Amino acid sequence: MAAIRPAGKPEGTWALPKGLIGPGERAELTALREVKEETGVEATPVEKLGDVRYVYTWAGERVFKVVSFFLFRYRAGRLGDIPAEHAHEVAETRWLPLEEAPGLLAYKGEREMAAKALERLSR
């Protein structure tokens, strides 16, 4: 599973690529774009895994966020070949063994999505 250590996060903080939906863009296309921008890898969609909903505070305001996660299959590219205009977003990239990913990802919702991916691929 392609994972990133977001810029500014401590060593060992592994996360899944994600980002904001662009104007007129569907969630699946956003996910494909973000994977390419943050990892350098091109992917082919397999299926939607689910949504993670959470609330956080930004500049004193509560923000409700929904992040959609998709299962993709590797298509092309080299992990870490991040386009220069996005290199500031990512400190490090790594392939996580799928069986270990639920225990290595830093965020609960992402660990749950990794477990769903593992379950889906084990069928």
Which residues fall in each region the model found?
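Unchanged
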Residues: I21-E112
